[in-house]
A protein has these predicted regions:
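Extended, charged low-complexity regulatory segments
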Residues: 1-175, 179-187
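Pre-Walker A (Motif I) flank of P-loop NTPase domains
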Residues: 190-194
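Hydrophobic anchor at the beta1->P-loop junction of P-loop NTPases
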Residues: 196-198
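Walker A (P-loop) phosphate-binding loop of P-loop NTPases
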Residues: 201
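Conserved lysine of the Walker
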Residues: 204-205
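Walker A/P-loop NTP-binding motif
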Residues: 208-218
Length: 218
């Protein structure tokens, strides 16, 4: 498929994902408005409203922030056209009527291969695709083949560009650029005590914050 066609297809998926996220928030807003209308005690009603309010806030969409930053094509051994495709992003976005997710939360177990798979250990993945964005607009993609016969690829230019982007203002997340050894730390079991060491600017604080986000998710 020509690159322009691929970009068009991926932009369509991004638009569909944003529409689905809006639908999720609208449904939550309706539930929030109806909370307490069917009776029940005041404490239960207030707890429900607080839960729904937090979910409404969590479902707010910032059009300048990409909903997803990567894609995994899981090898089903039935041909590339029948691969299971999974988009990896900062939050879970459900399909219509709770069907297959349009975007999988980066903290979910199914997203682990995005960070750890390689040609020597593909973890069932045929293709890993990274996306480049500019102010929320999908502008580029980069494919890394991991299936049978694949060889270790050169370093990703999109990944390098994101890692080397100047750090200004508040600390930004690193979910699109987490490295395999960092991912192991982020997803370590709750019972494990970790000591993360490194020189200034090597990402110690970012790893710690993303580990906290992972533990809250799990």
């Amino acid at each position: 498929m020509p690159d322009d066609d691929v970009l068009g297809h991926e932009r369509a998926h991004l638009a569909a994902s944003r529409a689905a996220l809006r639908a999720m928030r609208e449904a939550t807003t309706r539930h929030f408005a109806q909370a307490g209308g069917a009776g029940g005690n005041a404490v239960s009603t207030e707890v429900l409203k607080q839960v729904l309010y937090r979910r409404m806030r969590a479902l707010e969409d910032d059009p300048t922030v990409p909903l997803f930053f990567g894609r995994l094509d899981y090898d089903t051994a039935l041909g590339a056209e029948l691969d299971e495709i999974l988009y990896v992003g900062r939050r879970h976005v459900s399909g219509e009527l709770g069907g297959d997710p349009l975007v999988m939360d980066w903290r979910a177990p199914m997203a682990v291969p995005f960070y750890r798979a390689g040609a020597d250990h593909p973890m069932g993945v045929r293709l890993r695709r990274r996306f480049g964005f500019s102010h929320g607009v999908l502008t580029a993609f980069e494919d890394e083949w991991l299936g049978a016969g694949a060889v270790s690829a050169a370093s990703s230019q999109l990944l390098a560009d994101e890692i080397e982007r100047p750090r200004m203002g508040p600390m930004r997340d690193i979910v699109a650029t987490i490295q395999p050894d960092q991912d192991v730390l982020v997803r370590s079991a709750l019972a494990e005590s970790l000591c993360i060491q490194g020189a200034p600017g090597t990402g110690k604080t970012a790893v710690g914050l993303h580990r906290a986000a992972y533990l809250l998710y799990s």
